[in-house]
Amino acid sequence: MALSRIYSSKLASANKNLLPVITTYVRNASDSTDLKAVLSEKIPKEQERVKNFRKQFGATKVGEVTVDMMYGGMRGIKGLVCETSVLDPDEGIRFRGLSIPECQKVLPKAPGGAEPLPEGLFWLLITGDVPTKAQVDALSREWANRAALPSHVVTMLNNMPTTLHPMSQLSCAVTALNHESKYAKAYSEGVHKSKYWEYVYEDSMDLIAKLPVVAATIYRNTYRDGKGIGAIDPKKDWSANFTKMLGYEDEQFTELMRLYLTIHSDHEGGNVSAHTVHLVGSALSDPYLSFAAGMNGLAGPLHGLANQEVLVWLQKLRKELGDNASEDKVKDFIWKTLKSGQVVPGYGHAVLRKTDPRYTCQREFALKHLPNDPLFQLVSNIYKVVPPILTELGKVKNPWPNVDAHSGVLLQYYGLKEMNYYTVLFGVSRALGVLASLVWDRALGLPIERPKSMSTDGLMKAVGAAK
């Protein structure tokens, strides 16, 4: 049974002694390797649960809205239902109640690997259950079988100018895949709304399977003179096929990609990309159009470009101070940055009030695999220096690093240095969360999104302010 945000929030904020209960709950999984069949069993139960919940508590208030919230990007307004993840200010993201360290512990791994397979994370997000290794292997095979691109999309990708931004190429290709939408076809033929989720599921599975092929083709065309990506290997997992198609054979890099694609997959429903997919999907647009819209949001500098900005800033710092810079020199550079009116990129978060656990797990990966890398050592020095400085300033609610403070450094180390491409990796990962949510949107019959807007004059009148 899926956890609603309301119940997930209560669990996530409860006493830590309850965590074994959460783990026991989500591990109560079906043995079936047929994901659609597992969902078919869960969905009617969740529909009934939500129906009864709304019947009993539908008129209950869950929050208030202030004028500042309306002018401030709706930050803090409780206005969405998201089943897949909850962001706790102190503990970070929880995927269906599980923290990142818990996911690293319980989700299946590749043979000889230490990082969770993204297939397992997707199974968890869409079902609420921790999958078995057999279920994850079956999902890997299914995505491999669904991965082939239609010829018109291949032709489109191969004829795009290499100067076109990789995110623009991704958006175009995903939109063109709409030609194959099973949901759009079923809708045009009058399928009953109770069946919408089944076709959204089929499209979502197809899209997730094809995204690494699209993304790898974009990379090879743009940065590797159009060298072919090769064929999908049905014996390899989703991440391993992706890294192979990108042209990388290093098993450590494949492990990094498994970690990267897992931890970037979902972050509640209110961020730009997730909310956009939900919003466009609420108009009953198919998953291809909805996801393409979300990717256009992810391409925005305030959402998907943060790790690039961190790298640019780090390279500037390294150029000015050199390698092995002392903590005092780093401190001076930080103060110089802040006094010039700039921020320290990669630090702070809209919701989090502690170090982002997505940063922590990447730091642990670096300590294990690249402890002597100069750029990583610089990041480590900054981690020691920045939080006390930001705390001293007293103007920052969260002086701790977020996920973007680290991810670019790891990609650079393994040779993926093309920063304009990083958002495409983010997009491939984010598909896991937003498309799992989209399936549940249709399963629960959520309506078209249509909040009420007000003018400034209307707001002033409503609160009794003089115009």
From Swiss-Prot:
Note: Citrate synthase is found in nearly all cells capable of oxidative metabolism.
PANTHER family linked to this entry: CITRATE SYNTHASE (PTHR11739), CITRATE SYNTHASE, MITOCHONDRIAL (PTHR11739:SF8)
Enzyme Commission numbers on file: 2.3.3.16
Keyword Transferase recorded: yes
Top-level division of the source organism's lineage: Eukaryota
Subcellular location: Mitochondrion matrix
Keywords tagged on the record: Mitochondrion, Transferase, Transit peptide, Tricarboxylic acid cycle
Family according to the record: Belongs to the citrate synthase family.
One BP term from GO: citrate metabolic process
Subunit structure: Homodimer.
The keyword Mitochondrion is annotated on this UniProt entry: yes
Annotated protein name in UniProt: Probable citrate synthase 2, mitochondrial
Native source species: Aedes aegypti (Yellowfever mosquito)
GO-annotated molecular function: citrate (Si)-synthase activity
Catalysed transformations (reactions): oxaloacetate + acetyl-CoA + H2O = citrate + CoA + H(+)
Pathway named in the protein's UniProt entry: Carbohydrate metabolism; tricarboxylic acid cycle; isocitrate from oxaloacetate: step 1/2
Alphabetized InterPro entries for the sequence: Citrate_synth-like_lrg_a-sub, Citrate_synth-like_sm_a-sub, Citrate_synthase, Citrate_synthase_AS, Citrate_synthase_euk, Citrate_synthase_sf
